[in-house]
């Protein structure tokens, strides 16, 4: 059977950037790695309802700078900035260094792989038909301007006795093209029948000479005239 490399891992340093940026020697590397993992788990648990897509961690000179990419920044910031200040204090205590938190708003959540996967998983948990959930997400992404999108769900779909895999795709998703900007994400839907895995690939265009092609909404296909 064909084995597929992680779409983001193979593009690191080409069209994708690392989500943790710091330098450590052999003695502190494992400590930093574990600390980053704990920070991400803590933030994802605290900000479940904030539609968080990605958490970037930078460690410049005995400090930590954490950037939270979210579609709902108001929930993260809270009333008069109270929630984000409490997060900063908790993370400073947890990491042992001064922490600065930046909030980046995601203006097009329909084109973010993690947010699309979360949306499909939440619909599956509400017992929406998996085909309807996938088709709706694909149509929204193509309408906003994606060049291609593929969604795959695996598990006991519809409460079936035997688990299976179903997928839906529109447009192009060129996994072998390294300059292709492909957003890949996975998420789990916890249903009464068990766990259903959701995978999303979104092709946003090719990065040529360090500049990404401009995303434009797909024009609707011309209607064919009925024969008289």
From Swiss-Prot:
InterPro entries: KH_dom (IPR004087), KH_dom-like_a/b (IPR015946), KH_dom_type_2 (IPR004044), KH_sf_prok-type (IPR009019), Ribosomal_S3_C_sf (IPR036419), Ribosomal_uS3_bac-typ (IPR005704), Ribosomal_uS3_C (IPR001351), Ribosomal_uS3_CS (IPR018280). The keyword Cell cycle does not apply. This is Small ribosomal subunit protein uS3. HAMAP family: Ribosomal_uS3_B. It comes from Pseudomonas fluorescens (strain ATCC BAA-477 / NRRL B-23932 / Pf-5). The gene is rpsC. Part of the 30S ribosomal subunit. Forms a tight complex with proteins S10 and S14. Belongs to the universal ribosomal protein uS3 family. It holds the Pfam family KH_2. One of its GO terms (molecular function) is mRNA binding. GO terms for biological process: translation. PROSITE patterns: KH_TYPE_2, RIBOSOMAL_S3. Keywords: Ribonucleoprotein, Ribosomal protein, RNA-binding, rRNA-binding. Binds the lower part of the 30S subunit head. Binds mRNA in the 70S ribosome, positioning it for translation. Transmembrane segments: none annotated. Residues 39-107 form the KH type-2 domain. One of its GO terms (cellular component) is cytosolic small ribosomal subunit. It comes from the Bacteria.
């Amino acid at each position: 059977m064909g084995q597929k490399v992680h779409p983001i891992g193979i593009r690191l340093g080409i069209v994708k950037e690392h989500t943790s940026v710091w330098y450590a020697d052999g003695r502190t590397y494992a400590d930093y790695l574990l600390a980053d993992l704990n920070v991400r788990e803590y933030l994802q648990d605290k900000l479940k309802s904030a539609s968080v897509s990605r958490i970037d961690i930078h460690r410049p000179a005995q400090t930590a700078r954490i950037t939270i990419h979210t579609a709902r920044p108001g929930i993260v910031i809270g009333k008069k900035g109270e929630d984000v200040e409490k997060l900063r204090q908790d993370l400073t205590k947890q990491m042992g260094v001064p922490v600065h938190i930046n909030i980046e708003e995601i203006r097009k959540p329909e084109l973010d792989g993690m947010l699309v996967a979360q949306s499909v998983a939440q619909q599956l948990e509400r017992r929406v038909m998996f085909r309807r959930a996938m088709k709706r997400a694909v149509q929204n992404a193509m309408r906003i301007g994606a060049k291609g999108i593929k969604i795959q769900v695996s598990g006991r779909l519809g409460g079936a006795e035997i688990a299976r895999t179903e997928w839906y795709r529109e447009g192009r998703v060129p996994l072998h093209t390294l300059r292709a900007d492909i957003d890949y994400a996975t998420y789990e839907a916890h249903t009464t029948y068990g766990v259903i895995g959701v995978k999303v690939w979104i092709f946003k265009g090719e990065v040529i000479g360090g500049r990404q092609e401009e995303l434009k909404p797909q024009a609707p296909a011309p209607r064919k005239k009925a024969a008289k």
